[in-house]
Amino acid sequence: QAPPKRQDEKPVQHHSAAISLGLVLTACKEIGLYTDGQIRSWRDLCATASFVRGMLGISADTWKEAEADMGEETAAIAIACILERTETIRSPGGYLRALAQKARAGSFSPGPMVMAILNAREPVAA
């Protein structure tokens, strides 16, 4: 029997679409390399994202703004996705600011970002 889920392991709800921590971690494997253990909860992901944001050159002010505009968990998902795509994102801080602006306007959901990363990995059927 599986252990009961802790409160902080519930899927993040955005625009009626839920995204699970497991899906985020399946898509965004890189973030797991920056923890001394495993990411087992949203709290773990948020703490790891807070650490990684500095390595990406994202200022503390930009991070706090993103957390305020998106919510802590969504901001952490955004960092995990940005980390996964560092080779294609020239300015991680600017990118996060743009996402935070969209969130403030109510037009951002992390689901499409996560799915785009997953779909990019899928082999194309011939």
Model-predicted regions and their roles:
Residues 1-126:
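Electrostatic interaction modules used in gene-expression and signaling proteins
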